């Protein structure tokens, strides 16, 4: 699979670790990954009150899902990020840089008021394209 970052001088450069657009030329499978939270496999919640720890667990959960489908984090082309506090933007992108090599996936981040558990600070869903 070939993934390419799309940029334009007509659009302000991203302020975080994401691409304006991501183009994929591939024959393969599209994988839609549900919203991942900081819940570990044993049911406990990682990093209660710690956005970096929660973001890291979310990324580990994304990684486990995409790897189970036969891909890698490099195959993730799009993420939607839901946060309880937009002031965590820099901390979240610091962790994302550890998991997403350039070209970073296209991304939307929105602040929401509630999640399925009051301890959750972040949730991310993703789309991956896994080449043959």
What annotation goes with each model-predicted range?
Residues 1-132:
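Short, polar/acidic, helix-capping and beta-turn segments at strand->helix junctions
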